[in-house]
Amino acid sequence: MARIAGVDIPRDKRVVISLTYVFGIGRTTAQQVLKEAGVSEDTRVRDLTEDELGKIRDIIDKLKVEGDLRREVSLNIKRLIEIGSYRGIRHRRGLPVRGQNTKNNARTRKGPRRTVANKKK
């Protein structure tokens, strides 16, 4: 397995797919990186030379990926919470942030149902 940005990427997959194992690199970014490095997307990771791997590493080092990106995202959320914005309040309460309906759905964000017992009459 080759290590790129601290992540072991699978050897048997195509390079363009393997690069998406790095947090912050999707298909589009992977394609752009390979184009800049001059590597074919269809190449398998095991077939890459050390020189090609080095080029890919250098390009990815310029991008914000893995730990740096995770830290930035968490700091952005923390900042929203601290300034008391609507989005920050939604984050704090664990509710959907982008205006989705919460009457029926939003189970992923709210977690498992907590049923409330009825009052006795």
Curated annotation (Swiss-Prot):
Keywords: Ribonucleoprotein, Ribosomal protein, RNA-binding, rRNA-binding, tRNA-binding. Residues 106-121 have a biased composition (Basic residues). PROSITE patterns: RIBOSOMAL_S13_1 (PS00646), RIBOSOMAL_S13_2 (PS50159). Transmembrane segments: none annotated. SUPFAM superfamilies: S13-like H2TH domain (SSF46946). The keyword tRNA-binding applies. One of its GO terms (cellular component) is small ribosomal subunit. GO terms for molecular function: rRNA binding; structural constituent of ribosome; tRNA binding. Gene3D superfamilies: 1.10.8.50, 30s ribosomal protein s13, domain 2 (4.10.910.10). InterPro entries: Rbsml_uS13_C, Ribosomal_uS13, Ribosomal_uS13-like_H2TH, Ribosomal_uS13_bac-type, Ribosomal_uS13_CS. Pfam families: Ribosomal_S13. One of its GO terms (biological process) is translation. Residues 93-121 are annotated as: Disordered. Part of the 30S ribosomal subunit. Forms a loose heterodimer with protein S19. Forms two bridges to the 50S subunit in the 70S ribosome. Belongs to the universal ribosomal protein uS13 family. NCBIfam families: uS13_bact (TIGR03631). Located at the top of the head of the 30S subunit, it contacts several helices of the 16S rRNA. In the 70S ribosome it contacts the 23S rRNA (bridge B1a) and protein L5 of the 50S subunit (bridge B1b), connecting the 2 subunits; these bridges are implicated in subunit movement. Contacts the tRNAs in the A and P-sites. This is Small ribosomal subunit protein uS13. It comes from Bacillus pumilus (strain SAFR-032).
